[in-house]
Amino acid sequence: MLELKNVSKQYGTKQALKDVSLTLPRGEIVGLFGENGAGKTTLMKCILGLTSCRGTITLDGEPIFRKNITRLSFGTSEHSFFPGLNAKDHRIFYEDHFPSFSEKRFQVLMDFFALPEGRRIGSFSTGQKNQFEVVLALSQGADYILLDEPFAGNDVFNREDFYKVLLGILEPSETVLLSTHLIEEVSDFISRAVLLHQGQIAGDHDVQELEESGRSLMDVIRQTYQYRSDRVLQALENLSDVDGPF
């Protein structure tokens, strides 16, 4: 179990995270939602030890250090691969450094995304780079897979097909923490939704329980973030007042 207790992070005068407590058991697909700047990426980086923070983060009761960090993997739109290497070079590197690396899963995902194995990753398109990030994160053999906006630069058809493949290849013991703005697309396959607002947990919902109560995840998110459906009309009216009729 991955557990966070009272995790806080501050950048200068900006409070990026404030007293975040969260438990992630094995075998869940958890959606992490929030506005831009809500703290989603910072939270993942704190879990992985990529940035310092206050509070405690443990994996099965133990702090996350070198001996258990390989149980976590990370796919990020900021990219963590070696741009000068090709896919084959990455496969060899991961086989040498991650004992649980799955060559079969790596190859299945490479074929699924139709990624060229001999080309330098730095020459890939943005969408291909993000796809390769996902390939590495899912092939590492980690128990906890953290994906931060993994679908940027990918069209809706690629995304929909990938969701199906993801559900098909995950083992029951693997946990995915997925940060995305594509709420409606992922609401059908995530089991839980964690909502961040201004660096704090604003909601933690079982998706099935929401559906049974007659509410959708989108309804809850709109309510949590006080979405104003009239703001588009108001903006157009304000423009019309300033500039005259279009």
Predicted regions and their residues:
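Helix N-cap at the start of a conserved alpha-helix in ABC-type nucleotide-binding domains
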Residues: 156-158
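Conserved ABC transporter NBD signature motif
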Residues: 55-68
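ABC-family P-loop ATPase nucleotide-binding domains
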Residues: 76-132
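The feature captures the beta-strand-to-loop junction immediately N-terminal to the Walker
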Residues: 33-35
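ABC ATPase nucleotide-binding domains
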Residues: 208-246
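Catalytic Walker B motif of ABC-type/P-loop ATPase nucleotide-binding domains
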Residues: 145-149, 154
